[in-house]
Amino acid sequence: MPNQGEDCYFFFFYSTCTKGDSCPFRHCEAALGNETVCTLWQEGRCFRQVCRFRHMEIDKKRSEIPCYWENQPTGCQKLNCAFHHNRGRYVDGLFLPPSKTVLPTVPESPEEEVKASQLSVQQNKLSVQSNPSPQLRSVMKVESSENVPSPTHPPVVINAADDDEDDDDQFSEEGDETKTPTLQPTPEVHNGLRVTSVRKPAVNIKQGECLNFGIKTLEEIKSKKMKEKSKKQGEGSSGVSSLLLHPEPVPGPEKENVRTVVRTVTLSTKQGEEPLVRLSLTERLGKRKFSAGGDSDPPLKRSLAQRLGKKVEAPEANIDKTPKRAQVSKSLKERLGMSADPNNEDATEKVNKVGEIHVKTLEEILLERASQKRGELQTKLKTEGPSKTDDSTSGARSSSTIRIKTFSEVLAEKKHRQQEAERQKSKKDTTCIKLKTDSEIKKTVVLPPIVASKGQSEEPAGKTKSMQEVHIKTLEEIKLEKALRVQQSSESSTSSPSQHEATPGARRLLRIAKRTGMKEEKNLQEGNEVDSQSSIRTEAKEASGETTGVDITNIQVKRCETMREKHMQKQQEREKSVLTPLRGDVASCNTQVAEKPVLTAVPGITRHLTKRLPTKSSQKVEVEISGIGDSVLNVKYAAQTLEKRGKAKPKVNVKPSVVKVVSSPKLAPKRKAVEMHPAVIAAVKPLSSSSVLQEPPAKKAAVAVVPLVSEDKSVTVPEAENPRDSLVLPPTQSSSDSSPPEVSGPSSSQMSMKTRRLSSASTGKPQLSVEDDFEKLIWEISGGKLEAEIDLDPGKDEDDLLLELSEMIDS
């Protein structure tokens, strides 16, 4: 195979094949430098081990082509260079004599003398030519050496050398008519590479004169070139493209020199035109300029076939072109072929001044469409509202020329408009804030996730106000609405207790989900009314949720100060009501309270409050037991309000699933209550008049525990003992609606209210499930050892008891 196959291109022409023996093509050193094709190989029967002839189609007589590298500063360094060398050279210490063949003179080419004239210019300008590239002859085998124009163009290799220039020259002379339009852009491609590569920019754009093959003097050729150049500048080729000379075989080194000259030389015109001393940036980068005259045919972006040199029939309108000097003073963006967006119209005006038809690129068309769409958008925005028109027109007025807005600018404008609309709406909201309709308040009570999501409950009202305005609320507005809601609920609560007492027998279902509980706690802490407002909130929600007879929409929102005054009055009333009853009644109240948290562990109502470690300053304990999936017992404990009230008397404040038991941290009442303990259990029974008869076994078991606990501690426990009691006592009041008969004084009405609320919390749920859940809860809290776990040491400090309680919850 290595002997019969084709020659390795890189081995024979560049001696650079690095594959060695693994190369599938033939490496035969005997054939190096030989240009004779093996006829046996052509017939497919060359079996010689060492064949001195080439197993490759030789399409050019390289021995008649001057070596390009001979005239370079480094000289030709190839040991087996097949090209013609006029002088001897040293390669790796070996002297190689000049070539023996004589270069034939070709009389047909009228340009060879011109090339000779360029030799002097080439000497100084061609220092740009860089390293001798190994790809210089990449196209050499494509064309035959005769002057017959080949039907196929040699493939364009970007850094290729001048070996294919002969073919280009043949095209330029004989196939000029068809080839010119195609190759007009080609020089630009190569011009862009001209700084770094030796590739010749393609072909002269001569139209008719090159058909005359008479031998002319140098002066005639130069004058003709200048005339052609003045005619054809601006035809879409660079300013030099008409001056580019097309080498034909020239005797001696002249052809070699001329070849290199063509790449960088620019000649100024004779007829008093401005000399183009330097190529413009467009020409050097190979970008296209607009075509002149009425020729709209060559597009700004050439097709792939044109760029690769395929022949395309061109319109004859190319011949008559008006000179275009306006391109000399183009802006940088225009010379780079990039039209700046704001100057689109200016650029088209310039083109029209010269009398040209401007062929738009795809980018320009897309930009125009985008600008039209944006213009439509702006007109729509103008029609929408006056605030929008101000913003959209201000941008248009600012610049006299039409300015295409970017996407980010449009977004910024929209945001600005929305903010203005928000400001206006917030002003309206602050001036006239009214309560929502009954149904919307029910939404906030029955569907608390709506309350939880920021300001969403406010939006239905906004939509009913005006469907045209889509309003996105700011954080400040949401906070304002929350504060207003807190005020509204607290105000409505002031009227609701009186309604509760007026209708003592009515049952109410209070539907509260998890998140409202958390929100209530947060809002209460923010309002600095931790104890009083939570019960007020519950009453308010009951009233708004279920009492349909009351028209809440007419209640106006009042200021926070008046609310606080009412709360203080209410607290004083409660103090009086708490101070009046006897100690025995107090004990019975506390026992009842201890039972009530058990009732709140209804499976349907779960509220998770964050556990806080007890601190003496706040003296709050939250017991959170989530052992049973649904029922969570939260005992909340606050002695703060007691210190406000001055007297250490207990106040009972019960919310469904959040119970606040307030008791005195003083030890003297504790001891007294221990003495009165027998009254405790006596007072419990009348309260649960309906359910005492049907005591479940769970109750008996739990009541057995109660005396044990109460022997060594009182029922009005300081700080932490009361929560434990509340965990133990059973749910006796889950269905009792009647007010307790034995509780005396104002506390009896209070107790009836609490009992009613508790019964409402558990109505609709079967009592057995409540008791079962409670049994499970007690069993889980105590870990199966009720008496052992719940026994408390009366001598322990309050903090020790609190720590024990938190440890028990954690375990």
UniProtKB/Swiss-Prot annotation:
This is Zinc finger CCCH domain-containing protein 11A. Its main location: nucleus. InterPro entries: Znf-CCCH_3, Znf_CCCH. Keywords: Coiled coil, Isopeptide bond, Metal-binding, mRNA transport, Nucleus, Phosphoprotein, Repeat, Transport, Ubl conjugation, Zinc, Zinc-finger. Interacts with TREX complex components THOC2, DDX39 and POLDIP3; the interactions are ATP-dependent. Interacts with PABPN1; this interaction retains ZC3H11A in nuclear speckles. Interacts with KPNA3. A zinc finger (C3H1-type) spans 2-30, 32-58, 61-87. It holds the Pfam family zf-CCCH_3. Transmembrane segments: none annotated.
